[in-house]
From Swiss-Prot:
Organism field: Rattus norvegicus (Rat)
Record's keyword annotation contains ATP-binding: yes
EC class of the enzyme, as a word: transferase
Protein name in UniProt: Probable gluconokinase
Binding-site residues for ATP, renumbered to this chain: 11-18
Amino acid sequence: METPGVLLVMGVSGSGKSTVGALLANKLGWKFYDADDYHSEENRIKMGKGVPLNDQDRIPWLCSLHDILLRDVASGQSVVLACSALKKMYRDILNRGGSDVPPRSDESAKEEPLAGGKFLVVHLCGSFELIYGRLLQRRGHFMPPELLQSQFSILEPPSAPENFIHISVDKGLPEIAAAVLEALK
């Protein structure tokens, strides 16, 4: 992958997005963003109460993330983003902006492609049981394990024509990182 580019590490909560994304950014020397850090307080409160987010909750968040990625890519900085990006529409917003969503009052909803073909989606996938078990062990996160089923219900795994790879979270962290680095060659 020629720089600048974007590596989107996606999957349901508990799939290891943040851990894998941070490791890859470190190995590649790229900037790392964890999308969870950019949720509005309202979204955090809603999830903390066990209420799943809907498209209206997610779209402004995704448009803001697109703007951050666009700024970095435009300045020549390659980026790793850890983000659930459960639906194709969400991944499209991250890559191309929000022109296919209802208009907003600000200018960030304009379509501005990030990196053309330099947008690789890494889908970290695993069984509900495995990931639910991980969530039960996790402490200090605003996303309760009870919301996992709602994420699996709306998940649209990447498929052609998206530029993607699926990686099982049954593998160890070194194996996952090696598979992604190989895909970037």
